[in-house]
């Protein structure tokens, strides 16, 4: 493929691009809108039918200002005496909590793992947008390792439930946001930390 791109001045076009799996399909400009609509409908038909899903009510997450930063229910973000350093802490609850999909769905946005990662999102946005001078973020996950591993089991076993499925994808997006935040993140491990499973 590299040789083709290097040797062929016009690159790889049309049918050859489809044959080489570089694109899913090709379409003349005159049929573009119709083909996009057809492909979108076909992709939508392949998804599970969720017509009976009621959704959940999303509540605003309030934060408390502390002497050195901000605190939510499960996440704290402190700016500490060191210059350009922040301390990000995720605190696990004492137990995994509900494991039944129906009970979890009933909790909605109050399900602790969902709320924690929504709070993490707010902390990351604070760092990204409002704290440009911060260069180093010391990260801790505190709590029981069994809770960190247990919530992964719940997410995996309940993956067929629409809500748990959506929360799992939300967690992935937040972890990608964490990885792509232009700060240096260091995990601080020690007694009482719980870097395991999703939190590893």
Language-model region placement:
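Glycine- (often His-adjacent) and acidic-residue-rich active-site loop
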Residues: 140-171
């Amino acid at each position: 493929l590299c040789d083709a791109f290097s040797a062929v001045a016009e690159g790889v076009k049309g049918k050859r691009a489809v044959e080489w799996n570089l694109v899913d399909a090709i379409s003349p400009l005159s049929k573009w809108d119709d083909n996009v609509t057809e492909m979108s409908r076909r992709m939508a038909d392949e998804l599970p039918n969720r017509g009976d899903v009621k959704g959940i009510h999303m509540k605003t997450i309030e934060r408390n200002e502390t002497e050195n930063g901000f605190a939510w229910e499960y996440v704290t973000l402190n700016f500490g005496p060191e210059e350009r350093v922040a301390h990000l802490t995720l605190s696990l609850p004492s137990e995994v909590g509900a494991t039944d999909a129906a009970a979890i769905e009933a909790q909605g946005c109050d399900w602790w793992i969902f709320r924690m990662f929504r709070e993490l999102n707010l902390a990351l946005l604070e760092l990204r947008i409002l704290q440009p001078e911060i260069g180093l973020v010391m990260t801790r996950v505190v709590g029981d390792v069994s809770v960190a591993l247990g919530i992964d089991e719940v997410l995996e076993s309940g993956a067929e439930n629409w809500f748990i499925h959506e929360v799992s994808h939300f967690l992935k997006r937040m972890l990608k946001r964490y990885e792509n935040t232009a700060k240096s993140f260091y995990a601080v491990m020690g007694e009482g930390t719980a870097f395991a499973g999703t939190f590893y």
